[in-house]
């Protein structure tokens, strides 16, 4: 959405007004960040392990009625994965992390992106549908394409609701730092909130 893009532009202008230097740059690895296929083996295997752990906690078999349908489907998909599939996904994940982190190693401090590609979705948009259990994951993936890369890379990131629509809907901006630089994120977010407070905003429900 244009409002998500504009939120980033306005945030960058605010950062400049606070004395920060802003340039148009990003990790080139993000241009081809396809998570749907490459890392399915990791996600589904982790879901299967989680389901097994839940069974141990409950002291019984976990049934399809115990967890969300999408999670159940992912756990079942893990049965199709081989050890080689999993190892390959872990290897690709490692390569991706290194490629993304190189941007920070080249001297950049922070990356500013939209938190979501669209404005916040109405309640009920993402649902578990028995006839298409993976639709929820697909919709979520289309909505938040720029947060999974940093879940994978393990870097600290923060979401700041600096912009608001005329209808009172928050428009989040994501700021990402290098490994171990949570201190930088908190300092910059504090500067932004002081300059443009958001605590008094209450979105309509």
Residue ranges of model-derived segments:
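Basic phosphate/pyrophosphate-binding loop/patch that engages nucleotide-derived ligands
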Residues: 104-105
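Short low-complexity, flexible loop/linker segments enriched in glycine and/or proline
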Residues: 35-46, 127-129, 173-176
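Short, surface-exposed loop/helix-turn segments at secondary-structure junctions
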Residues: 37-39, 88, 121-144
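Short, basic, helix/turn surface patches
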Residues: 47-61, 140-144, 180-194
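Structural helix-boundary/capping segments
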Residues: 5-21, 87-91, 98-101, 151-205
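Short helix-loop capping/hinge segments that flank enzyme active sites or metal/cofactor-binding pockets
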Residues: 41-101, 114-118, 123, 159-169
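Short, Asp-centered acidic motifs that coordinate Mg2+ and/or phosphate
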Residues: 109-110
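Gly/Ser-rich, acidic/histidine-flanked active-site/gating loops
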Residues: 1-44
């Amino acid at each position: 959405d244009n409002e998500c893009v504009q939120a980033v532009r306005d945030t960058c202008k605010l950062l400049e007004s606070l004395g920060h230097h802003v340039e148009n740059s990003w990790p080139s690895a993000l241009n081809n960040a396809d998570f749907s296929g490459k890392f399915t083996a990791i996600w589904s295997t982790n879901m299967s392990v989680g389901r097994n752990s839940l069974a141990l906690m409950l002291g019984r078999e976990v049934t399809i009625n115990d967890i969300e349908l999408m999670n159940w489907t992912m756990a079942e998909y893990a049965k199709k994965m081989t050890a080689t599939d999993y190892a390959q996904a872990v290897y690709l994940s490692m390569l991706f992390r290194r490629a993304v982190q190189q941007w920070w190693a080249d001297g950049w401090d922070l990356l500013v992106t939209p938190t979501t590609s669209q404005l916040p979705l109405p309640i009920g948009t993402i649902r578990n549908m028995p006839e298409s259990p993976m639709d929820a994951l697909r919709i979520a993936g289309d909505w938040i394409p720029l947060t999974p890369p940093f879940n994978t890379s393990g870097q600290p990131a923060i979401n700041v609701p600096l912009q608001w629509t005329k209808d009172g809907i928050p428009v989040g901006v994501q700021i990402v730092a290098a490994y171990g630089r949570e201190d930088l994120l908190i300092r910059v977010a504090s500067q932004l909130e002081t300059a443009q407070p958001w605590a008094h905003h209450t979105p309509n429900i």
